[in-house]
Amino acid sequence: MVQSLKLKKILVTGSSSRFCKYLKEDLKHYNVFFTSKKNFNILDFKKMEKFLKNKKIDYLIHIAGLSRPMSIHEKNIGLSIDLNIIGTANIVKACNNKNIKIIFFSSNYVYPGKKGNYSET
């Protein structure tokens, strides 16, 4: 399986994230494109879909989003909704349209830091 992935084109969103710093090292022997919001804006659906088509992406690892949405959410709810909800929905829709497999990453920062009625799996 790992050998067959070396033949696939993989796109990773959120390349400036702390997590991607480590992922870049782990995936250096694969055909991976690390994108940033400059060249792959998850809020611009048409450009994003064109990029995916032109690069002929097989897999998309979605990491882009706000790393601490709860603190930013209070200051700018629009930005939080745009990046973490609308942007992710755009990724899912574009990948679905192009038959691209998605791997989605998130962190514990999606929780407000208070004990609540939720669990992690």
Regions found by a protein language model. Give the residues of each.
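Conserved Rossmann-fold NAD(P)-dependent oxidoreductase catalytic core, especially the SDR/UDP-sugar
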Residues: 90-121
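Glycine/Thr-rich phosphate-binding loops of Rossmann-like dinucleotide-binding domains
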Residues: 20, 42, 70-71, 112-113
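Rossmann-fold scaffold of SDR-type NAD(P)-dependent oxidoreductases
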Residues: 13, 58-63, 104-105
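Short alpha-helix in the Rossmann-fold core of NAD(P)-dependent oxidoreductases
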Residues: 81-88, 103
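N-terminal Rossmann NAD(P)H-binding glycine-rich loop of SDR-like oxidoreductase domains
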Residues: 2-29
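NAD(P)H-binding glycine-rich loop region in Rossmannoid oxidoreductase-like domains
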Residues: 45-83
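Adenosine-cofactor binding site in Rossmann-like domains, unifying the SAM/SAH pocket
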Residues: 31-51
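Short, well-ordered alpha-helices that flank and scaffold nucleotide-derived cofactor binding pockets
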Residues: 21, 25-29, 53, 89, ...
